Amino acid sequence: MKLKKTCIAITVAVGVISLSGCSTASALSGLLSDSPDVTAQVGAENTKQLAGVTAKADDKREVKVSDSNIGKIDSSVKKSVEVSTIQANTVNAESITVTKSGSWYDPVVCWILVFIVLLLFYFLIRKHEKKEA
């Protein structure tokens, strides 16, 4: 009887946790900023720009620019930039993608884990009831 009450309490607790949300990103949302990641495809590699530090090798390429009022161009392919906002008048790139952190598989994994825990408790209760009978 004591095991059954414990299993019911754990099942209710798991249900409350699963209904309140169990995203892996939500646990750190208070510590991290809510700004989206910005990815700009300019060359052969995507460069993520967000608030944080990443370590990448800096590979330089020679670029010749004509008819431009830009004095100096940093043409590195694997450049890591730390920014919190991006402001530009004109951006010329092959593609620019702005994404917000979070994915569809976090809730799916959470629900699968809840289902497995509920199945384990069900079989544990059945095994305990068979021993008592």
Swiss-Prot record:
Effect of residue 22 to S: Complete loss of lysis
Cytoplasmic side: 126-133
GO biological process, one term: killing of cells of another organism
Lipidation (N-palmitoyl cysteine): 22
Segments on the Periplasmic face: 22-104
Signal peptide from the UniProt entry: 1-21
Keyword Isomerase: no
Keyword Membrane: yes
Positions where lipid (S-diacylglycerol cysteine) attaches: 22
Cellular component, GO annotation: host cell plasma membrane; membrane
Swiss-Prot/TrEMBL keywords: Cytolysis, Host cell inner membrane, Host cell lysis by virus, Host cell membrane, Host cell outer membrane, Host membrane, Lipoprotein, Membrane, Palmitate, Signal, Transmembrane, Transmembrane helix, Viral release from host cell
Disulfide feature: none
Superkingdom in the source lineage: Viruses
Residue spans crossing the bilayer: 105-125
Name of the protein in its database record: U-spanin
Species of the source: Escherichia phage T1
